[in-house]
Amino acid sequence: VITLLGTLAVAVLSAINPVEQMNRSRDTSTRSDAEQLINAVDRYYATKGFYPWQTSADPTISDPTLPFTEVRADWIENGGDDSVLGKLSSGGAAEIKESFVSRIDAEGYNHLWIYNDGKQGSSTYACFIPKSSSFKDDAWYRCSGQGDFGELPADFPVTEACPGDCTNDDLGATPDGCYSCLP
């Protein structure tokens, strides 16, 4: 009986996997931050008529295209001098809090990357490299077109978000380096 209970206890503890649970919690938090960033960009665009990485609504003056860019406090607008996060935070439109900027720019944070191809009607994507197995699997499934994800949208940053084997659905194991992207 004691051996059986010991075996069950080991099985339950193995199934819980505290490291995986911590990584999943961090990935969930990072995904929430990505959602907040996308929402702030959308609100800024709705208010100003151009993206925060632009200096004006005129595409001949300021290109709306945003290459795959790491989101950091020193991220500067295209052709300008202002910090994009500064324009979104209390120093600008107040779409995000200064504490949000400090958190996503901190050392040890799983940094966000943002992308928009600049075409009318295209989505803005906020991406990160997941740490938990479940988020890594989801990122790989999306990149390789498996499961319920289907085909990637035409404006999705495939080259940057799905490097190496991330688009290969024949692999026996999840590759590292696939980005989890929203929306």
Where are the model-predicted features located?
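Proteolytic processing hotspots in large secreted/extracellular or virion-associated proteins
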Residues: 110-120
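Acidic, glycine-rich loop-and-strand cores that form catalytic or ligand-binding grooves
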Residues: 58-111
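Membrane-proximal amphipathic alpha-helices
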Residues: 23-34
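Short, surface-exposed interaction loops/tails
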Residues: 119-183
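Charge-biased, low-complexity intrinsically disordered regions
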Residues: 7, 25, 55-58, 114
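Alpha-helix exit/C-cap motif
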Residues: 14, 39-58, 94, 98-107
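Extended, hydrophobic alpha-helical segments
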Residues: 25, 37-41, 96-97, 123-128
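N-terminal single-pass transmembrane signal-anchor helix
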Residues: 1-18
